[in-house]
């Protein structure tokens, strides 16, 4: 079975009532994904989210480790990744 190059996932921040469909590199590290998400949220909300530096990403029922990649975390097309304040 070939590994996918990209993964289509929905990133949801329910606290701010926003969900973003994203096509992401399968080997993207969770730490880099957090930075990308925070950048998007800051652009939408005009510089807010400075207190979210220590946010966490949740997939299924577990908090994702910063050193994992999307692929190693078991995230596949159609996955929902939740953003939460930690």
Task: Give, region by region, the residue ranges found by the protein language model.
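Ubiquitin system architectures
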Residues: 1-86
């Amino acid at each position: 079975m070939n590994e996918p190059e990209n993964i289509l996932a929905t990133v949801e921040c329910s606290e701010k009532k926003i969900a973003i469909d994203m096509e992401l590199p399968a080997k993207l590290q969770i730490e880099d994904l957090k930075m990308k998400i925070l950048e998007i949220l800051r652009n939408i909300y005009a510089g807010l989210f400075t207190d979210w530096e220590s946010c966490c990403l949740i997939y299924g029922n577990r908090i994702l480790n910063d050193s994992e990649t999307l692929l190693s975390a078991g995230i596949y097309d159609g996955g929902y990744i939740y953003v939460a304040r930690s």
